[in-house]
Swiss-Prot record:
Biased composition (Pro residues): 568-613
UniProt comment concerning the protein's domains: The signal peptide, cleaved at the inner membrane, guides the autotransporter protein to the periplasmic space. Then, insertion of the C-terminal translocator domain in the outer membrane forms a hydrophilic pore for the translocation of the passenger domain to the bacterial cell surface, with subsequent cleavage.
Site features described as Cleavage, chain residue numbers: N643, A644
Region of interest (Disordered), ranges: 561-619
Miscellaneous notes: Synthesized only in the presence of low Mg(2+) concentrations.
Quaternary structure note: Monomer.
Gene behind the chain: prn
Descriptive protein name: Pertactin autotransporter
Autotransporter domain residues: 654-922
SUPFAM superfamilies for the chain: Autotransporter, Pectin lyase-like
PROSITE patterns given in the database record: AUTOTRANSPORTER (PS51208)
Amino acid sequence: MNMSLSRIVKAAPLRRTTLAMALGALGAAPAAYADWNNQSIIKAGERQHGIHIKQSDGAGVRTATGTTIKVSGRQAQGVLLENPAAELRFQNGSVTSSGQLFDEGVRRFLGTVTVKAGKLVADHATLANVSDTRDDDGIALYVAGEQAQASIADSTLQGAGGVRVERGANVTVQRSTIVDGGLHIGTLQPLQPEDLPPSRVVLGDTSVTAVPASGAPAAVFVFGANELTVDGGHITGGRAAGVAAMDGAIVHLQRATIRRGDAPAGGAVPGGAVPGGAVPGGFGPLLDGWYGVDVSDSTVDLAQSIVEAPQLGAAIRAGRGARVTVSGGSLSAPHGNVIETGGGARRFPPPASPLSITLQAGARAQGRALLYRVLPEPVKLTLAGGAQGQGDIVATELPPIPGASSGPLDVALASQARWTGATRAVDSLSIDNATWVMTDNSNVGALRLASDGSVDFQQPAEAGRFKVLMVDTLAGSGLFRMNVFADLGLSDKLVVMRDASGQHRLWVRNSGSEPASGNTMLLVQTPRGSAATFTLANKDGKVDIGTYRYRLAANGNGQWSLVGAKAPPAPKPAPQPGPQPGPQPPQPPQPPQPPQPPQPPQRQPEAPAPQPPAGRELSAAANAAVNTGGVGLASTLWYAESNALSKRLGELRLNPDAGGAWGRGFAQRQQLDNRAGRRFDQKVAGFELGADHAVAVAGGRWHLGGLAGYTRGDRGFTGDGGGHTDSVHVGGYATYIANSGFYLDATLRASRLENDFKVAGSDGYAVKGKYRTHGVGVSLEAGRRFAHADGWFLEPQAELAVFRVGGGAYRAANGLRVRDEGGSSVLGRLGLEVGKRIELAGGRQVQPYIKASVLQEFDGAGTVRTNGIAHRTELRGTRAELGLGMAAALGRGHSLYASYEYSKGPKLAMPWTFHAGYRYSW
C-alpha cells in the first residue's frame, strides 16, 4: 500500500504537466493546479522531495492548501522549485525535513524548502528543519538565484540554519517568525561571483531569533552587495551580533527592536568553540562580546529603532568603511559601549577608510562609553537634529592592523544635539548650535564653536570636584558654562595650549559660599597675546558668589578671572611740587640706648566680625536676605497694623457710652531704603477684627477690648524677584475718652511673622529662603480735641510706639548662610487734626477731617549677616505724613470710617495708604 501511494505521489507531476500542455495547445491559459491540496506527503528516501517543480514541468500556478509534508532522507527537500515560470502557493500547511541537506563536496546549500527558480507564496504555513545538526544542515528556507522569489506571510520558519537568501534572490516576509537560526543574506566573498546581482529581502513586523545552539553568528547576517529592509518587528540573539552587515551590504532598519535575548555571556556557544577563536563570517574574537549591530564596509540606517546591548559588547560596532545613520529611536548599553569602532571583518582587511556614525532626529544613546575606539582608524561621529548621547569618548592604544592606516577621531555636534560625557581622545570637536556637557577633566585637540554652541562643565555632585578642559586650539564663538567653589578657592578652568581666537562668553553658576581668600578666581588661561576675548553671559555681566557680585577681567597675560564688582575708588590728587631741600648738615652719631625691660604679654583683641567692603554690590540672594531681615521691615508691617486710634475704632465720640465690635481693612504701598540692601517696594494689605466693652467713669469712659488680624506684605526686588511676609497678630487695647476732649489710647500686640523670598540669581536660577520670627510691641497715643460751637474742631496728637522683633537663622537654597539678629524700633509722632462735625437728619452725623504729622524713628536698626558678613540695616530718620478721612454715624449703632494718607521720608516713603472700617455699637 505504501508503494502504491508513493507511485501516485510521484506520478502526479507528470499528469499535471501533460494537462498543462494540452490546455496550451487549445489556447487556454495555464491552470491553477490543486493536486497537492489537503494531502499528507511522507517520504524517507535520499533526495525524495515532497513537492518538486522542475524546469521541465511548465509554467503555471500550483497550490497546496492544507497540506502536510514530511521528508527525512539525505538531501531530501520538502519543497523544491526549479522552474522560473512556476509559482507555488502553499497555505495552511506545514513542511518538515530531518535529513542531512548540506552537500560538503560542492559546498551547496539546501533547505527544507528550496527555491532556485520560480516563486513561492506561503501563507499561514510552518517550514521547519528539525535535523539534529546545526547551521548549514538546518536551513528552513533557502532562496538562491536571480530568478528565485519567495513571499511569506503569517508563517513560522524554524531551523538551526534559519533562512538563507543569496545570489540575487528576492524575498518578502510579513508578520512572521523566523526562529532558531536567524536570517542569512549573501555568501562569503570567495564563494560569490563579482557580477552576481544583489539579493533583496524585506521584513515587515517579523520576529527573527537566533539561539546559541544554532551557531548563527548573527540573528540577521547580510554579507556582500545585498540589501535588507526591516519595518517593524524584533531581532533577538545571535552568537556575536543581532544584525551584521559586511562587505558592501545595505541595511534599512525601521521600527525594529534588537536585543541579545538569553544568549550566554561572552558569546560562548554550547557544544564547543569555533576554531581560531573567530566566528564564521569574519567576526572578531568572541571576547569582544555581543553587538546589537555589527557593520563593516557597509551602510546601515536605523530609524525609530531600539538597540540594547549587554554588559560585554556594544549597541553598534563599526568596522572599516562603515556608514551608520541613526534617526530617532534609542541605543542603550548601560554597562558597556554604545558604539565601538575599529573591529569587524578582521579576516578581510580592506584599505582603511573613514568610519561615519551619525545620530540625528532625536536619537538617544546611553552607555558607559558613547564611543570606544579600539583601533586608530579615522572616525567621524556626528550628533545632530536634537540627538542626545551620554557616555565618554575613549580610545585604546592598541597597535594597528598591518596594512591599516591610522586617522583622526572627529566629533561634530549640531542642530540642538547634546552630548554628555568626557574625553581625552577627540582630535577635533565642532559644536554648532549644540551642547557638550563635560562630566570630567577632558582634552581636545581642536575645539570650534558656532551659533551659540556651548560647553557645559557639569555641576558636580560634591563640592570641590572642579573640572579642567584643555584644548590645543580654540576658535569660533560659543558659550562655556562653569562652576566656582568659592569657599575652597577653586573653579572650573578652560586652558588653551597653542592658539585661541574668537569671541566667547562665560556663564558662571551662582555660589552661595564666600571666597576663601582674596577676590579673584581664575577661569580661563590662554597663550599670551592670543586674539580670543571672553565676556560674562550672566545677567548684567556679573556673577553672584556668596554675598557679593563679581565681574570678569583680563590681566593682559592671557588670564581671565572673576574679580569683585567694586566701584572704582576716587582718584587721589596729584602731589604739588614744593621747594627743593638744600643740603643737610651731617647728623652726629646717636648714643647707644640702654636695654628695655621685657614687656608683659598683651592680650590680643578679638577679631571683629567681617564688615561689608565699601562700594561692593550685593548678590541677589544676599540683597533679598538683607531686605527681608532686620527690624526695619518687620516694624513697617507692625505700624501698618497699629496706626492711629481713629483708623482702628473710627470716631468713638460719635457713639458715646457704647461698647461694640468692629472690623477694618487696610492697604499700603511702601518704598524702603535701609542703607544696606538695594531700594525696594512693598505692598501691605490686611484686616483686623476686634471688640470692646465701654466702662463709664467720672469725667469720661474706658473702652477695654481685644483684637486679632492678618497682614501680608509683598516685596519686589527690582530685577531680581521678590518675597513676602505673612503676619498673624493678637492683642488688646485700652482707650480712655474724657468728656473734656482728652483721650488716651494704649495697645499691646504680639505677632508671628513668616518671611520668605524667591529671587533669580545672575545665572537665571531661582534662589529661595524662608524663616519665622516673632515680634511684640506697645503703643501709647494721647491728644485733646478743642471743639467750636459750629462743629469745627482742632485736635493735637502725640504718639509713641516701641516694637521689638526677634531674629532667625537659615540657609538659602544656594547655600548662603543668613542670620537675622532682629532689633528694636522706637517711633514718635506729633500730629494735628482739623475737622468738622456735621449733623444730618435722623440723628446721623458725618465728620470729615484732615491731618498732618511728623514722625521720628529713634532706633530702627538691626543686623543681618550673610556668611558671617554683617550688614547694618536702619530706618532712623524723620518723615512727614498728610492724611484726610471721614467718620460717619449712620444711626442705631452703625458707623463707618475711611481715610487716605501720604508719607514721605529719606528712607521710608508711603505713596498711598487706605483704611476702611465698620463699627457696630451696642
